[in-house]
Curated annotation (Swiss-Prot):
Role summary: One of the primary rRNA binding proteins, it binds specifically to the 5'-end of 16S ribosomal RNA.
Superkingdom in the source lineage: Bacteria
A Pfam family it matches: Ribosomal_S17
NCBIfam families registered for this protein in UniProt: PRK05610.1 (NF004123), uS17_bact (TIGR03635)
Biological classification of the source: Bacteria, Pseudomonadati, Pseudomonadota, Gammaproteobacteria, Moraxellales
Gene that this sequence comes from: rpsQ
Protein's name in the database: Small ribosomal subunit protein uS17
Subunit structure: Part of the 30S ribosomal subunit.
One GO MF term: rRNA binding
Organism from which the protein derives: Psychrobacter sp. (strain PRwf-1)
Length: 95
């Protein structure tokens, strides 16, 4: 882990913390994170994969494509960003 990333204290219930994979880091101080989840189909009961792309704030530009990161919901930072990077769970391998 990097010491550059702020440690965020999480308190209370209902705090939105999710883990996902970085699919883009081409913006300055911003990353796009792909969140995948499984939901049950209401009629047929089959497990279906659903995904969401979320833009998050990366203050120190530490993330690379392919990293697995943890992000937390926060106040709106811009028109499309209301999530902040908490830490990098797993770094991507160099190919």
């Amino acid at each position: 882990m990097s010491d550059d990333i702020q440690q965020t204290e999480v308190s209370g219930t209902g705090v939105g913390i999710v883990t996902g994979k970085v699919v883009s880091n081409k913006m300055d101080k911003s990353i796009t994170v792909l969140i995948e989840r499984k939901v049950r189909h209401p009629l047929y009961g089959k497990q279906i994969r659903r995904s969401t792309k979320i833009k998050a704030h990366d203050e120190n530009n530490v993330c690379k494509e392919g990293d697995v990161v943890r992000i937390i919901e926060t106040r709106p930072i811009s028109k499309t960003k209301s999530w902040k990077l908490v830490d990098v769970v797993e770094t991507a391998e160099k190919i």
